[in-house]
């Protein structure tokens, strides 16, 4: 996830480094939640992938993470383990699912616009690398608008304990009075497995008598975005009510297909 050479290419030669063929989450959260109670942790899970995004910048100055693949449209189980942002396993029905990887990507892409700048002193990533990132202690990343009018921070927590951070905000073009938060975590009690994905969290206000200092508490087994941007449109997995996929259906047999597609479809 980066080394001294990728850092050199960026810092000394001004090259923009991309993380090409970055893995998408490889799990079926409605099943894995039965094993780990969150559906988010484990090797190649969504928190692991979020850690790769953060670590690839902190350790290798990689500024783009390209998911491979973004959409999976192969037959379920016919190729390899699930790996996608959008699950489209039923080409005969048109059914698709905005999977956990989609909401993971939303945490980053909707709260950091093209051209935003990384705050190197407010980025950090660690953990043990072995085709995954495990046993982390801290993983966070901060970006700001070029004119310093907006700011977003991204956190992960794969542990079973709350991670607490004290953040001092200064030299910005806005008065740091309150931050909004968006959190993805596992279900509580008898909730549905995706009940707490991409949900608005509590407002984060300054510590008393320290108007520029904030305490941020990252829940166990979660992905968290803290931002000055508008979050009023966020509504969990119902954030995009106009997106209504076709109903799932079994493949009717015998199945025939002439494989003749228009240029637009291809």
Report each predicted region and the residues it spans.
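Active-site-proximal beta-strand/loop segments in catalytic clefts of secreted hydrolases
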Residues: 1, 20-24, 67-71, 155-158, ...
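Active-site neighborhood of glycoside hydrolase catalytic domains
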Residues: 1-27
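Extracytoplasmic/secreted cell-surface and envelope-processing proteins
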Residues: 2-5, 26-31, 74-77, 162-164, ...
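Aromatic/acidic polysaccharide-binding cleft in carbohydrate-active enzymes
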Residues: 19-135
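Carbohydrate-binding surface patches
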Residues: 121-177, 221
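Solvent-exposed beta-hairpin/edge-strand motifs
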Residues: 170-193
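C-terminal beta-strand-rich structural cap/linker in extracellular carbohydrate-active enzymes
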Residues: 199-242
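Extracellular glycan-recognition regions
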Residues: 233-266
């Amino acid at each position: 996830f980066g080394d001294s050479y990728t850092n050199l290419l960026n810092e000394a030669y001004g090259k923009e480094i991309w993380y090409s063929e970055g893995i998408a989450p490889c799990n079926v959260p409605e099943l894995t939640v039965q094993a780990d109670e969150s559906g988010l942790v484990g090797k190649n899970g969504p928190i692991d992938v979020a850690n790769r995004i953060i670590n690839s910048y902190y350790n290798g100055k990689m500024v783009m993470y390209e998911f491979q693949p973004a959409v999976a449209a192969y037959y379920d189980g016919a190729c390899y383990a699930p790996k996608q942002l959008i699950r489209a396993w039923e080409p005969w029905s048109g059914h698709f699912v905005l999977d956990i990887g989609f909401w993971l990507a939303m945490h980053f892409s909707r709260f950091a616009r093209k051209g935003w700048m990384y705050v190197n002193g407010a980025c950090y990533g660690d953990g043990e690398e072995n085709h995954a990132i495990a046993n982390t202690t801290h993983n966070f990343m901060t970006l700001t608008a070029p004119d310093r009018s907006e700011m977003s921070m991204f956190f992960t927590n794969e542990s079973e304990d709350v991670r607490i951070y004290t953040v001092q905000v200064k030299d910005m073009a806005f008065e740091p009075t309150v931050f909004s938060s968006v959190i993805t975590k596992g279900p509580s009690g008898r909730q549905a497995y995706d009940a707490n994905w991409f949900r608005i969290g509590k407002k984060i206000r300054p510590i008393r008598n320290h108007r520029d200092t904030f305490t941020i508490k990252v829940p166990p087994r979660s992905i968290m975005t803290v931002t000055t941007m508008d979050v009023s449109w966020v509504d969990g997995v119902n954030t995009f009510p106009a997106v209504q996929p076709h109903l799932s259906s079994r493949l009717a047999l015998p199945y025939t297909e002439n494989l003749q597609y228009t240029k637009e479809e291809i």
